[in-house]
């Protein structure tokens, strides 16, 4: 039970610290979305989704990177798992490592018209940096009490 509590604490702290950093950066950079760049040259193009806040960095990828980084740190990277979508007919995607989904998420966010590649890749870095900092500074053993 103690290890489960530790894992949940790590996931939540990583998520909170990553979200704070991500949203700080979004409004620091205030970068435009792909549809702002594409539609003036191709008015028939439309994104799958729109968002009312800046593009860079990707909140989705910042958090995905942080959460997957915590799972990787806790269990090791080579863990097979599946993710089932309740939104798209219950389709399940299978992965062999915790690091594997990030590439697909980067591509999906670009194809949806939500992000540029640079924003997505830097989001993965941001989430990873938060997890590395957390691993070095938080949740250190305190001995037996």
Language-model features: locations:
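Hydrophobic alpha-helical bundle signature of multipass membrane enzymes
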Residues: 1-145
């Amino acid at each position: 039970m103690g290890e489960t509590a530790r894992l949940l604490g790590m996931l939540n702290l990583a998520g909170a610290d990553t979200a704070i950093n991500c949203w700080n950066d979004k409004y620091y950079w205030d970068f435009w979305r792909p549809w702002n760049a594409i539609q003036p040259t191709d008015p028939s193009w439309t994104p799958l989704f729109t968002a009312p806040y800046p593009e860079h960095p990707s909140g989705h990828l910042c958090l995905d990177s942080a959460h997957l980084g915590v799972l990787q740190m806790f269990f090791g990277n080579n863990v097979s798992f599946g993710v089932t979508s309740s939104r798209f007919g219950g389709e399940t995607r299978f992965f062999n490592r915790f690091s594997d989904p990030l590439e697909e998420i980067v591509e999906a966010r670009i194809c949806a018209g939500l992000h540029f590649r640079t924003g997505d890749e830097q989001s993965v870095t941001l989430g990873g940096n938060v997890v590395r900092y957390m691993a070095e500074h938080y949740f250190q053993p305190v001995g037996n009490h």
